[in-house]
Amino acid sequence: VMRLSDNPVLSTVSWFYIWLFRGTPVLVQLLLWFNLALFFPTLGAGPLSVDTNDLIKPFVAALLALALNEAAYMAEVVRAGILAVDEGQTEAAHALGMSQGQTMRRIVLPQAMRVIIPPTGNETITMLKTTSLVLVVGAGDLLTRTSAIAAREFTTIEMLLVASVWYLVLTSVASYGQYHLERRFARGTSAGSQASVGRRILANLRPGRVEGGVR
């Protein structure tokens, strides 16, 4: 939303943030956060200062790296969704006396969600798989646990397959949720009123049905 601001300071800051985090590899960001103590041994000032190594644990480093990187991508997804809504509707809402916040909540966002949800689902699935990178800092994710078992039991291939199955389960659950969210926000539109491909195929395979719908 800051990218759409008329304030040049806000729009510039948001542009720089998105440019920086989208333009550098996630693994590099992860390693920089994990080794932050090399640049800043302590954080804070005076009696409020804390040792960076005590604060930036592997889990915290992974959380910061993945969250900030994903936020940069999602910022562009949300911006695209808002821009997809006809500007005339915003002007009409303002003409009816709605404030900027009311227009965003009641007019813009409900329509923008139809554009936002599909790429958000894709980003969620990508993020689930990207968590495997935290193996390099030992943050205790799924791949870290399976790799530890593989090293102990000498079952590298087997544990990689187990991890792959779990990733498939997680991404399938995310895809299922995305599908139902898309259907919910597509109600009342041409996309929401269309029957699914499977239902149309089943309808065409009913006994006695011929071309044109005439027996």
Report each predicted region and the residues it spans.
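Transmembrane alpha-helices and adjacent helix-loop boundaries
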Residues: 1-215
